[in-house]
Design a protein with these regions (language model features):
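Secreted/periplasmic proteins that engage bacterial cell-wall peptidoglycan
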Residues: 23-89, 94
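C-terminal motif of bacterial Sec signal peptides marking the signal peptidase cleavage site
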Residues: 12-15
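Sec-dependent signal peptide recognition
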Residues: 1-9
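Bacterial signal peptide processing site
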Residues: 17-20
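Aromatic- and glycine-rich peptidoglycan recognition patches
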Residues: 97-175
Length: 175
């Protein structure tokens, strides 16, 4: 019964969040969860290890590319700000150079849903991105190098990703 009540509360809180970019896009409360276990649970891309290693680990196992699709995993390169890289699941492609992602630990101890990421690379190849920063309510000023996108096998809709997010949090917390 307690589990059902908790799930109802999570779904109710998620429903309260509008389409805007604000704290309403936080999923649940504080969670001690890294990006990789969460992305693995949400996307089905069964890779292990630090996020920056996912690109090489995916070779020969998953399709890799430079065009986003919902359900794929955006892999950030290691950088001064991201010493282990970062991974985020694409929840929607809104424009050719703008996507929404659902991710863990971009904001420490938080899962954020439908956060904007824009391609600022000179070659329009998603090799350099800027990410929405929820605490400020706007796009972050940092520029982050990225490898590209890993596809799990089939695309997912934004609604499917939103519905799967609370369960992915629970799965990732057990890993």
């Amino acid at each position: 019964m307690r589990g059902l009540l908790g799930m109802f509360l999570l779904l109710t809180l998620a429903a309260c969040g509008g389409g805007g970019q604000s704290e309403a896009n936080y999923v649940g409360g504080d969670v001690a969860l890294e990006c990789a276990p969460f992305a693995r649970a949400l996307s089905g891309v069964a890779l292990r290890g630090p996020a920056d290693g996912w690109w090489d680990e995916a070779a020969g196992r998953y399709q890799r590319g430079f065009q986003p699709e919902a359900g794929s995993v955006l892999v950030f390169r290691r950088s001064a700000r991201l010493p282990y890289g970062h991974v985020a699941v694409v929840s929607d492609v809104t424009e050719p150079r703008r996507i929404l992602v659902t991710q863990a630990n971009w904001v420490q101890h938080r899962v954020t849903a439908d956060q904007a990421v824009i391609d600022i690379s000179p070659g329009n190849d998603w090799s350099l991105v800027r990410v929405f920063w929820p605490p400020s309510g706007g796009m972050g000023s940092g520029e982050y190098p990225a490898y590209g996108f890993i596809r799990a096998g089939r695309a997912a809709s934004r609604e499917q990703i939103a519905q799967a997010t609370p369960r992915a949090v629970q799965i990732a917390l057990k890993q």
